[in-house]
Amino acid sequence: MSSAVLVTLLPDPSSSFREDAPRPPVPGEEGETPPCQPSVGKVQSTKPMPVSSNARRNEDGLGEPEGRASPDSPLTRWTKSLHSLLGDQDGAYLFRTFLEREKCVDTLDFWFACNGFRQMNLKDTKTLRVAKAIYKRYIENNSVVSKQLKPATKTYIRDGIKKQQIGSVMFDQAQTEIQAVMEENAYQVFLTSDIYLEYVRSGGENTAYMSNGGLGSLKVLCGYLPTLNEEEEWTCADLKCKLSPTVVGLSSKTLRATASVRSTETAENGFRSFKRSDPVNPYHVGSGYVFAPATSANDSELSSDALTDDSMSMTDSSVDGVPPYRMGSKKQLQREMHRSVKANGQVSLPHFPRTHRLPKEMTPVEPAAFAAELISRLEKLKLELESRHSLEERLQQIREDEEKEGSEQALSSRDGAPVQHPLALLPSGSYEEDPQTILDDHLSRVLKTPGCQSPGVGRYSPRSRSPDHHHQHHHHQQCHTLLPTGGKLPPVAACPLLGGKSFLTKQTTKHVHHHYIHHHAVPKTKEEIEAEATQRVRCLCPGGTDYYCYSKCKSHPKAPEPLPGEQFCGSRGGTLPKRNAKGTEPGLALSARDGGMSSAAGAPQLPGEEGDRSQDVWQWMLESERQSKSKPHSAQSIRKSYPLESACAAPGERVSRHHLLGASGHSRSVARAHPFTQDPAMPPLTPPNTLAQLEEACRRLAEVSKPQKQRCCVASQQRDRNHSAAGQAGASPFANPSLAPEDHKEPKKLASVHALQASELVVTYFFCGEEIPYRRMLKAQSLTLGHFKEQLSKKGNYRYYFKKASDEFACGAVFEEIWDDETVLPMYEGRILGKVERID
C-alpha cells in the first residue's frame, strides 16, 4: 500500500493517550484551533485554521500538547490582518504568487513601492526619479492600480511631481486606498484559495517549493483519483510527484502537526459523511450525483423475505462471533436494522463520472451525404431569397406606376383643355365648410318652408356643366339663360359633361381628393353651396340620359349657345317614356331621346387607354340592371331608401355613390338598383351611424304636418299628370315650379320610414302562456337563439318556438322549435314571432 493511501488511514495521534505524554492544558487555554469534529454539517472548510509546524513550550516550561498549533504561529498571524501577512516573508511571497494567478500583482508591488519610497531620503537625487517612476508605472497609465485610485488622489500626486514638491507621504493616500481594496477583495479570497490551503496542509515545514515556485504542485494526498478524460491515459506521474522528496514526508512530527487538518479532510472527503451542500466538479454535473436513503437498500434486501449472507450486515458486531442459534427471530433482525438506519442516517452514493458525448447534431456523417444536405438547404434558401426579391420588385413597380399615374392626372387636371373632370358636381369651395353641416341646415329650412324654392335655384336646375378650373379665370361672367319656346334638346356633343357621362374608372376615382382640394380654390357663396347640396340630395346627375337643362350658372366661355328651337325638359318630361329605353343600347336610347339629332356613332368616346376598363364597368352595370329587373321588390325598397342615405351618408360616400350610378339620373326614375347592394362582388361601404339616422328621421318626421302631407299627395298627382303629358307631347316646361319642394318631400318621408323599419328588427314573443305578448325593437338585421336568450329577463329552462312560413298546412305557417344557440331565428312577415314555454 502506497504512502498516499496510508495518510488517510492513520489515526489521530492527539486522540490517543500515552503515559509519557505531557499534561493537557488548562480548560479554556487549549489554543485557537479546536479539535475538528468529523460530523456532517459542522465542518467549516471556508477558513480552516492554520496549524503550526513548530510546537514550542510556554515560558513556564509546560508547553502545549503535541499536534496543537501555537497561538502566535505565522499561519495564525496571517489570518489576523493583511499587515501580518505582508509582514512575513513567506506570507508576502505566497500572497504575491496568488495575485500573479489572479493577474493583479501590481497592487502588491505598488504597496511595497510606497513603503520603500517612504524610507528614502528626500535630499537624495534618486528620490525624484523613483517618484516619477512609480507615477508612470502604476498611476499614469490605465493599470489596475490607476483604476482603483480616486481621481483626487491621482491629481494630487501628478501636481506634486510636476511642481517637484516631493514628500515622503505623497503616496500614503494612494497606498491606503490600495490596501483597503486588497483587504476587501484579494485578501479574503486568498484565505480560501488552494494555494493557502495547500500551504496549511503541508504545515509550512518544507520551504523548498518556495524557492522553486512549486506552490501549484502541492495536491491533496488522499481522496479520489483526478478525473480522467475519455481520450487520455492515466499515468502515475502525479503520484510520483507527490512522493518526491520535495513533498512533505510522513515523519512523526509532520503527522502530529497536521492531525487536525487531516481529520477535517477525512470528514470532508469521506464516504459516509459526504456534505450535500458542497459543489460538484463541473465535469460531473448532471451525472447522477444523488443520495439514496439507507432504508432503500435494507428494505430491498428484505423484500423477498430471504435471509441470505448478502442481507446481513458483516461490518458491525451484530453477527460477529454469535452462534446461529442465538441470532434471534426475524423481527429482532428487522428491529436492529431499523435502529441502525436511524443511527447512520442517509448513505451518500458515490457518483460515477460519465464520459463526454458529442451532441446528436455533431455526429460525423459521410462527406457526400453532408454535401447533399447542405446543397438542398442552400437551394431552398436561395429560392426564398429570390421570391422575396421578386415580390419587392413587383411592389416597387406598382408604387411607381401609381405615382406616375397620379402625376399624369394632376398635369391633365391643370391644363386648359375643355375636358370635364368626372367629379365636376362637387363644389370647388366645399372644403371651406363641412358639406354635411350645410346640407343639414338647408334641409331644415326647406322642410320648414315647403312651399318656397331654394334661394336662387330653380326646381330642376343642376349646377354648371363647365369645368371648375375655368371658374378661376371667368368667375365674373354669368349668363342667365331663358326658357326657349320650343325645339329639341341640343346635340350630345354640345354638352361636355354629357359626353363624360360614361364611366368612372379607378384612375378617376383615385384622384378625387387631390383635384378638388388642391386645384379649386375659388370660394363660393353659401347660397350656391346649398343649391348644389340640394341637387345632390335629389340625385340629379348632370350628364344623365333623362335630364338636361340649363340654369343660372357660370358658363363655360367656349360652350356653344343653345339653339333657338331648343327647349328644356323636366324630371318627368323626357322625350320618351322610361319604358321605351328598356331593352335598347345606351347609344340608341340616347339618340331616341335627342329626337334623331345624334346617332350612336356620335356618342362620346373614352380615351383609348381606358376603353377596356370602362367597358368592363359598363358590362357590370348592365348586369346589375338585369338583376334588378328580376327583383322588383328589392329594387323598389332600395330606391326608396336611397334619398335618406344620400342625406345622411358621409360626403365621400355620397360622391362615390353618385358617380358610380353614372348616367342613371334621378334615383326615382332609375330601373337599375344601386350596384353596391346588388352586386356581392363589390366591397361593402362603411355603414352609416344608425343612431344618427334614426334621430334625423324622427326630427324630420316631426316637422312634417298633415296639411303638408295632403299637398304632397296633390303634388304627386300633378306630377303624374305632367309626366303623362310629357310622354305624349315629347317635351314640356315645368307645370308648377312652386310644387317642387313638396314633390321632393314625399319620397324623402317614405324613404325615411322605410329606412327606419329596415334598420330595426321587431321581435314579438309570448312568455309561458301569458295572453299579452312582449314586443321589442332590436337594431340588427338577424337574430340568433343565443342573442334571443340574452334579451329574456328571466333565466331558466325553456323551450323556444318561432313562427315561420310553411306549405305543409292550410294556415301557411308553423311554429318550429329551435334549440341551437347559433341558429338564426326565422322571420314571419318581416318580424320574429316566438313562444317561450317552461320545461316541466
From Swiss-Prot:
Compartments in which it is found: Cytoplasm
Domain of life of the source: Eukaryota
Biased composition annotated in UniProt, kind: Low complexity: 303-318
Keyword Transcription regulation carried by entry: no
Residue span of motif Tankyrase-binding motif: 21-30
Region (Interaction with GSK3B): 327-413
Tissues where this protein is expressed: Expressed in Tcf7-positive innate-like T-cells (at protein level).
Keyword Cytoplasm: yes
Compositionally skewed regions (Basic and acidic residues) per UniProt: 56-69
A Gene Ontology biological process term: chondrocyte differentiation involved in endochondral bone morphogenesis
GO cellular component: beta-catenin destruction complex; centrosome; cytoplasm; nucleus
Modification after translation (UniProt): ADP-ribosylated by tankyrase TNKS and TNKS2. Poly-ADP-ribosylated protein is recognized by RNF146, followed by ubiquitination and subsequent activation of the Wnt signaling pathway. Ubiquitinated by RNF146 when poly-ADP-ribosylated, leading to its degradation and subsequent activation of the Wnt signaling pathway. Deubiquitinated by USP34, deubiquitinated downstream of beta-catenin stabilization step: deubiquitination is important Wnt signaling to positively regulate beta-catenin (CTNBB1)-mediated transcription.
Ranges of Basic residues composition bias in the record: 468-478
Ranges for region Disordered: 1-75, 300-363, 398-435, 447-485, 572-614, 715-745
Main location group: cytoplasm
Annotated segments matching region Interaction with beta-catenin: 413-478
Domain notes: The tankyrase-binding motif (also named TBD) is required for interaction with tankyrase TNKS and TNKS2.
Free-text function comment from the UniProt entry: Inhibitor of the Wnt signaling pathway. Down-regulates beta-catenin. Probably facilitate the phosphorylation of beta-catenin and APC by GSK3B.
Subunit structure: Interacts with glycogen synthase kinase-3 beta (GSK3B) and beta-catenin. The interaction between axin and beta-catenin occurs via the armadillo repeats contained in beta-catenin. Interacts with SMAD7 and RNF111. Interacts with ANKRD6. Interacts with SIAH1. Interacts with SIAH2.
Protein name, UniProt field: Axin-2
Protein species of origin: Mus musculus (Mouse)
Lineage, highest ranks first: Eukaryota, Metazoa, Chordata, Craniata, Vertebrata
